[in-house]
Amino acid sequence: MAGDPLLPALHTGVERLGLTLPEGAAEALITYLRLLERWNRAYNLSAIRDPGEMLHRHLLDSLSILPYVEGDSLLDVGSGAGLPGIPLALARPGLTVTLLDSNGKKQRFTRQVALELGLHRLRFAQARLADYRPGQPFDTVVSRAFAALSGYVPEALRLCRAGGRVLAMKGRLPEEELAALPRSLRGCTLTALDVPGVAGQRHLLTWTAPAVSATEEANP
């Protein structure tokens, strides 16, 4: 949204992240934020109410993982209001993003965002993670504070193509959650994220899917 007072802060944050956005993406991100702000008053989509705080803790936090997204298809598990999936879709127009969430109210919001912003590569799936059976595996599967790792990682690997990436966005390093995983799944890559305007710790955990995923076995 041109002329929005939050636009300079977004540009500064994106620069600090070392990213370059395609033309029009910054304005579209602000439009998305304003839609979230407006819908949030009635539908309680986010506990964060202040738009400036939303910019840092939602938009920039989501964009911070852009360099770690692999391939052309991404599944956002427990996407809620579309985070991180919608910011990633706006920042990388060639990316096909599927938003998976069991909450119909939140899916109605994200569908409206897709309509208003012309996000034709955005897909929607209303289901629980354990019940979701896509036709094809994804290049990247991501969750943002969705659930404990033990309930996420095995299912995410099932939905990821061979050699693809499973990403989990967390605050503090979840040592207890990692310890609760089967031994074969504890070997992940840990990355500390420096998100502009976010004081607390942010971590990205990355797993590489094995040679043949469960979805590929079921759909040879």
Swiss-Prot record:
Record keywords: Cytoplasm, Methyltransferase, rRNA processing, S-adenosyl-L-methionine, Transferase
InterPro entries to which the protein is assigned, alphabetical: rRNA_ssu_MeTfrase_G, SAM-dependent_MTases_sf
Reactions that this protein is recorded to catalyse: guanosine(527) in 16S rRNA + S-adenosyl-L-methionine = N(7)-methylguanosine(527) in 16S rRNA + S-adenosyl-L-homocysteine
Pfam families: GidB
Main location as per UniProt: cytoplasm
One of the record's GO molecular function terms: rRNA (guanine-N7-)-methyltransferase activity
Subcellular location: Cytoplasm
E.C. code: 2.1.1.170
Binding site for S-adenosyl-L-methionine: 78, 83, 144
Top EC category: transferase
Chain's role: Specifically methylates the N7 position of guanine in position 527 of 16S rRNA.
Name of the protein: Ribosomal RNA small subunit methyltransferase G
Species in which this protein is naturally found: Alkalilimnicola ehrlichii (strain ATCC BAA-1101 / DSM 17681 / MLHE-1)
